[in-house]
Amino acid sequence: MTTKNKKAVENLEKTLTKSNLVDSAEQLELLVERVKKAQKIYSKFTQEQVDKIFKAAATAADKARIPLARMAIEETGMGVLEDKIIKNHFAAEYIYNKHKNAKTCGIIKENKADGIKIVADPLGVIAGIVPTTNPTSTVIFKSLIALKTRNAII
């Protein structure tokens, strides 16, 4: 890793904090309400807007793959750094490339002969369970899928 890249990774690590921890039922309720409001706004986004956000999130996740891998090992005490980095990279790049052209907003399929339309609508706020064995790659995967489908995830 070049000195420039190492500095960039170190700077990124400093911005990734645990400041969003929820430690009470009241905090959780407030967070859920905020997420619900944000998701309602996001549910109105166009396919073009969603795709732009999806790409930006995948790119950001891929850039953060090294510090996220380090943090996962520090927090769980499990894993091999290089393996975590590869999993994070795979989660970001593969999911983006697999779904970047998928229609996820509005009418996604139409059979004019039968008058049938398939419409993609978000579910709303969904819960994401994260295993200790692969915390960061799982969060990357689930977050990207939630963004692509205009859902919010907690």
Task: Explain the meaning of each model-derived region.
Residues 101-154:
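Conserved small-residue-rich beta-alpha loop and adjacent elements
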